[in-house]
């Protein structure tokens, strides 16, 4: 089955806040829109049975969107397709360099070599890891 074409405008030549706004809005529609299903909405209770704060949920959502936007702008990952999924690039083995296995897409930038590692890509990987760790820390019950 052929893969759908990438969403237009996710990776562009613009820089700064314009890219962050465009990427953040598309990521919001991809990952958090209620039409995507129950998994896109915050659960009513945390796994430990305690009520999860909406403030924490919003902080996690903003952190995730910022981490993805930073990584996409640096050329580490790219969002393709629809349905709120980040898919492996064609020709990449599942889990290669730990990127596809982490739910992110390894891809080849038109102007440079293949970027398939989260660490060592002009600092973008480190911040992406920090963002994911922060999300995990905030989602864990006390």
Curated annotation (Swiss-Prot):
Mapped to this chain, the residue ranges on the Cytoplasmic side of the membrane are 141-142
Q: Carries keyword GTP-binding?
A: no
Q: Which UniProt keywords apply?
A: Cytoplasm, Membrane, Mitochondrion, Nucleus, Signal, Transmembrane, Transmembrane helix
Give the signal peptide, or none: 1-40
Enumerate the subcellular locations listed in this protein's record, separating them with semicolons: Nucleus membrane; Mitochondrion membrane; Cytoplasm
Query: What residue intervals traverse the membrane?
Result: 124-140
- Give the principal location in a single coarse category: nucleus
Q: Which residues lie on this side of the membrane: Extracellular?
A: 41-123
Give tissue specificity per the record: Widely expressed in the adult with highest levels in placenta and testis. Also expressed in a number of embryonic tissues at multiple embryonic stages.
How does the record classify its membrane topology? Single-pass type I membrane protein
Tell me which GO cellular component terms the UniProt record holds.
mitochondrial membrane; nuclear membrane
Q: What is the protein name stated in its UniProt record?
A: Taurine up-regulated 1 protein
């Amino acid at each position: 089955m052929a893969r759908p074409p990438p969403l237009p405008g996710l990776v562009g030549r613009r820089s700064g806040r314009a890219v962050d706004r465009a990427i953040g809005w598309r990521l919001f529609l991809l990952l958090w829109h209620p039409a995507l299903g129950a998994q896109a909405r915050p659960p009513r209770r945390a796994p430990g049975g305690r009520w999860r704060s909406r403030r924490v949920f919003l902080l996690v959502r903003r952190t995730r969107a910022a981490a993805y936007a930073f990584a996409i702008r640096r050329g580490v990952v790219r969002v393709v397709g629809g349905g709120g999924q980040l898919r492996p690039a064609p020709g990449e083995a599942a889990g290669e360099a730990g990127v596809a296995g982490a739910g992110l897409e390894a891809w080849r930038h038109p102007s440079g070599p293949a970027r398939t590692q989260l660490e060592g890509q002009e600092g973008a990987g480190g911040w992406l890891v920090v963002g994911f760790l922060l999300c995990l820390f905030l989602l864990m019950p006390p």
